[in-house]
Amino acid sequence: MPTINQLVRKGRITPEEKSKSRALHSCPQRRGVCLQVMTRTPKKPNSALRKVAKVRLTNGEEVIAYIGGEGHNLQEHSIVLVRGGRVKDLPGVRYHIVRGALDCLGVDKRRQGRSKYGAKRPKAAAK
């Protein structure tokens, strides 16, 4: 335990908080190029084929990002926008691809929660 005099001279250092999305380098989003589009299986007890993409960001880092929503148009060399946000049942997937931005189309026929999937407001039905 330090003495008061030692604390006056040196002070205490507070540990720096590490970001959960380090590859973005303190930016809200980053642009990137899809290197590979694949499916991954989640941890127990879940079962599915989750769609993910390996993306090389503009800062040179390679990350694995989740493609949300039903169906997508991504393939190799697609330009995508990547945001932070992990997928709890996919180990190593700490990023999301933004739907409706750059080459990634929004989810069509989406009625609720449209803003999260880049879906436009549907036209009102004719009376």
Swiss-Prot record:
Xref: InterPro entries: NA-bd_OB-fold, Ribosomal_uS12, Ribosomal_uS12_bac
Keywords, alphabetical: Methylation, Ribonucleoprotein, Ribosomal protein, RNA-binding, rRNA-binding, tRNA-binding
One matching Pfam family: Ribosom_S12_S23
One Gene Ontology term from the biological process aspect of the record: translation
HAMAP family registered for this protein in UniProt: Ribosomal_uS12_B (MF_00403_B)
Family: Belongs to the universal ribosomal protein uS12 family.
Protein name as catalogued: Small ribosomal subunit protein uS12
